[in-house]
């Protein structure tokens, strides 16, 4: 049985901090607590408008994170420069729109393969492992392979937000098909977006997925039971469901 890794997105800790313009709660301290609680990695999105995570946060996180740091970022010159200076373990290129509450969908790579190839090359030359956040779509996977990344993160948002069983099954089949196609290229597969304690089960049972990125659900539960307990609960679910896939 392959272990399913869990990375915690701590953007939402920073959102609470910035709502009142205080210095607390500190997402850097949250990362420390998360690692002490068994998390496998820390994910942060440094947005162009710095609405939650700040430059100060990412600099300190790079110094203190002992597992892996995954920097989500837009494909801009500014972010590439910051990433090359910071040298996180991973960078995940994501789409970014100023008015969105959270990332609304995956990258559309079809007409920007050359641009993405150049960005991936710069990041790779800096020693950073690069992934692309894409929808579960065959053409996007083909484009990812052409761009030259070794890892993709499949957007589980439509699956997670499905309003009925039929739609959820349809989206799940798309994810399954996309995983099979990505594996034919030898790509490593992560997944995330919108996953919570109720809908994560069937995604966790897909044994080809290496890591899940989950933030809002864990931080929300932590408000009531604490971050260590919220992480423990999610990790136990992932372990239980991954075992069921092997039975």
Swiss-Prot record:
UniProt catalytic activity: 3-amino-2-oxopropyl phosphate + 1-deoxy-D-xylulose 5-phosphate = pyridoxine 5'-phosphate + phosphate + 2 H2O + H(+)
CDD domains the record matches: PNPsynthase
Keyword Transcription regulation carried by entry: no
Keywords: Cytoplasm, Pyridoxine biosynthesis, Transferase
Family, similarity comment: Belongs to the PNP synthase family.
Role according to the record: Catalyzes the complicated ring closure reaction between the two acyclic compounds 1-deoxy-D-xylulose-5-phosphate (DXP) and 3-amino-2-oxopropyl phosphate (1-amino-acetone-3-phosphate or AAP) to form pyridoxine 5'-phosphate (PNP) and inorganic phosphate.
Subcellular location: Cytoplasm
Top-rank EC class of the record's enzyme: transferase
Residues carrying the site annotation Transition state stabilizer: 153
Gene that this sequence comes from: pdxJ
Binding site for 1-deoxy-D-xylulose 5-phosphate: 11-12, 47, 52, 102
Protein name per its UniProtKB record: Pyridoxine 5'-phosphate synthase
One Pfam match: PdxJ
Keyword Lipid biosynthesis: no
Active-site residues from the entry: 45 (proton acceptor), 72 (proton acceptor), 193 (proton donor)
Lineage: Bacteria, Pseudomonadati, Pseudomonadota, Gammaproteobacteria, Enterobacterales
Subunit structure: Homooctamer; tetramer of dimers.
GO BP terms in the entry: pyridoxine biosynthetic process
HAMAP family in UniProt: PdxJ
Involved pathway(s): Cofactor biosynthesis; pyridoxine 5'-phosphate biosynthesis; pyridoxine 5'-phosphate from D-erythrose 4-phosphate: step 5/5
A cellular-component GO term for this protein: cytosol
Single annotated GO MF: pyridoxine 5'-phosphate synthase activity
């Amino acid at each position: 049985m392959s272990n399913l890794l869990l990375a915690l997105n701590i953007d939402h800790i920073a959102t609470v901090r910035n709502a009142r313009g205080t210095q607390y709660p500190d997402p850097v301290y949250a990362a420390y607590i998360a690692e002490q609680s068994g998390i496998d990695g820390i994910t942060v999105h440094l947005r162009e408008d710095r609405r939650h995570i700040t430059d100060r946060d990412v600099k300190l996180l790079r110094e203190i994170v002992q597992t892996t740091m995954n920097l989500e970022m837009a494909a801009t010159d500014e972010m590439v420069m910051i990433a090359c200076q910071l040298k996180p373990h991973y960078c995940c290129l994501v789409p970014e729109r100023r008015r969105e509450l959270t990332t609304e969908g995956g990258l559309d790579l079809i007409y920007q393969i050359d641009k993405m190839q150049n960005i991936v090359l710069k990041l790779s030359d800096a020693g950073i492992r690069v992934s692309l956040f894409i929808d579960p779509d065959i053409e996007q996977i083909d484009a990812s392979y052409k761009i030259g990344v070794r890892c993709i993160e499949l957007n589980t948002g439509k699956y997670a937000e499905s309003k009925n069983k039929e739609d959820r099954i349809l989206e799940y089949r798309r994810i399954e098909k996309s995983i099979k196609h990505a594996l034919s290229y030898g790509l490593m597969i992560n997944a995330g977006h919108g996953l919570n304690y109720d809908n994560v089960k069937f995604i966790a049972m897909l044994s080809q997925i290496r890591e899940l990125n989950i933030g809002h659900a864990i931080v929300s539960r932590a408000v009531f039971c604490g971050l260590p307990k919220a992480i423990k609960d999610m990790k136990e679910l992932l372990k239980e469901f991954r075992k069921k896939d092997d039975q």
